[in-house]
Amino acid sequence: GLKVLKYTFTMNFEEIAKKMCAKGKGILAADESTGTIAKRFKSINVENTEKNRLTFRQTLFSSKAMKDYIGGVILFDETIRQKTLIGPTIPDLINKNGAIPGIKVDKGAKPLAGSKEETVTEGLDGLRERLKKYYKLGARFTKWRAVYKIDDNYPSSQCIKSNGHALARYASLVQEANMVPIVEPEVLMDGPHDIDKCYQVTTNVLNECYNELAIHKVNLRGTILKPNMIIPGSLCSKKVSAEEIAKKTLDCLKKNVPNEVPGIAFLSGGQSEIEASKNLNEINKINDTNFLITFSYGRGLQASALKAFGNDQKNSNAVQKAFEHRAKMNGLSSKGEWSEGLEKAAAA
């Protein structure tokens, strides 16, 4: 196993960014905070203890899907420090299975002073020191999430500017520490807005982010963008096809994301597992850019596995089977080779 570690550790951040989004692979978001995983466990009647969190995550990280379909895993502070129940640390286990360990470094979205319904992401204080520690623990990439809600007056330019500035300062510090920053500006799908409103807001958000990244001298070749897809709000009465979602999403990326960015890994943002795979597949079917377009899913990869864990916490086989199926489906989507037929055949 050590050979793998040494190899990863000598790569520079541009090479790591490429490896994380290699064709047919994506990123597993397993960085739920203790509060968020509490909600997930509650829904399956599992007690939210450190041991249960470790058992569930370790089961995913040791699955054979890791080698084939997962390029990187985003961890939470608790998880990157944990020893597995079978010996090595969690980052060692992930490395051994061919993926790159990463860490969420933001401290959460906090109320934005002067705009009480919006948030700004905190976590810059002490970040330089924390990054050194995470590097020693094995992390080679990081994540920071900014959140924008759509409403009549939102997102405000205050929110778009504050979050863009924080994302850029974060990214600059991360590259200084020789790691890859995942830049995640999430325009939420909550609300009744239509797909065109999502397009327009996402355009403004991406523009501001890339302006700030340029000001802060971030090397875009060593970054990954984790954006939302261009989709209608969850309460929008006008439904749209996966084809339209793909067309508008790709168009928005082409117009607003600089060419140097090597990889774009979508968040699933509350889409169902199947929707998330189908939409990603449609985007890749028409992808005529140099971007490697893939997934960075949390629930989009874990929902079925969580259900299996709820049914029987001792049955790691069932949990791994559910996870392997989703990872494989999304691996296919990242190449534009997914189909409903394969979905059903594999699940049978």
Regions found by a protein language model. Give the residues of each.
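Conserved radical SAM core fold
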Residues: 108-112, 147-154, 188-192, 232
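Conserved, mostly hydrophobic/aromatic
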Residues: 49, 144, 183, 225, ...
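Active-site-adjacent beta->alpha loops and helix N-cap segments on the catalytic face
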Residues: 150-161, 193-196, 271-279
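Short, Lys/Arg-enriched N-terminal segments with co-localized hydrophobic residues
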Residues: 1-10
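A glycine-rich phosphate-binding loop feature that marks nucleotide/adenosyl-phosphate handling sites
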Residues: 224-230, 341-346
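Short glycine-centered, acidic/aromatic-flanked micro-motifs in structured strand/loop junctions
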Residues: 105, 146, 185-187, 227, ...
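Alpha/beta catalytic barrel-like cores
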Residues: 9-137, 150, 238, 242-248, ...
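Alpha/beta enzyme core
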Residues: 58-62, 87-95, 100, 119-141, ...
